Amino acid sequence: MSKPVLQIQKLTKTYMLGKRPVQALTDVNLQVNEGEFVAIMGSSGSGKTTLLNVIGCIDKASTGQVLLDGIDVSKMPENQLYKIRRDKMGFIFQTFNLLPYLNARENVELPMEGKIKSKADRKKRASELLTIVGLSGRENHRPQRLSAGEQQRVAIARALANDPAIILADEPTGNLDTKNKHEIIKVLAHLNLTRGTTIIMVTHDNQAANHTERMLLLKDGRIVKEKEGLHLAKKNHKCPHCGSSIALKDDMCPSCKMPLYASEEIFSS
């Protein structure tokens, strides 16, 4: 059985708006196991990004406990949290945040500088990661010479740089056109299927969410619904519609011709 990578218990987060307290998260309980691909959905202001920031040790909970890879980060001081962020987490954002004066490989190398002393080893690993995300031959291109989809692939490779316990993706397809959205979500799903990469993704996109195996709906700072995603069918190599065998590369069942990822509304209001 997979071990828990993330355990959250009775988490709350309160901000002060002037003198008025605003509850962003209320009594959140969540466990994510090693190798899971989980989507967090919800309307603007529901608490999605706040939850991701707390998980990512960018913000601290007001009350409750957060265990990351067995380590309690809830009360950890900042001088220790930066090592947790560097060693245990990979971050992917809606904006790619690539340094324009560095090429693709150098951008991927940056997070490794505190962990891998050899420049040659960093260069080799960065090149390997860029190949994994489909950018072989583009290593020496600077961001301005890459398409938006390619820049996000570089950001994904950078997130994998230190072999993190978990990837946190905040609207990773938000700045992309339809074609690139589909390609990027397929890259993430492929990493999860083939490498067992644990991913938590915040998204508004129904099709992107259905590439995960578990979808959570956040409303007014609480997890109110949970639903199984179609990605789980691929892990089981079984079509959710007719039960026929499917391969990892399939987007449509070869037997019943039904799509393996849907784009319709997941959580009805």
What are these regions (language model features)?
Residues 4-6, 11-218:
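ABC family nucleotide-binding domain
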Residues 240-246:
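Short Cys/His-rich zinc-binding micro-motifs
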Residues 258-267:
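Short Cys/His-rich micro-motifs in 6-15 aa windows
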Residues 246-249, 254:
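Short, charged/small-residue-rich alpha-helical element at the C-terminal edge
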Residues 3, 234, 248:
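Flanking scaffold residues of small Cys/His-coordinated metal-binding clusters
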Residues 222-237:
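Conserved beta-strand-loop-alpha-helix hinge in the C-terminal portion
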Residues 239, 253-256:
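Short cysteine-rich clusters marking metal-coordination/redox-active sites
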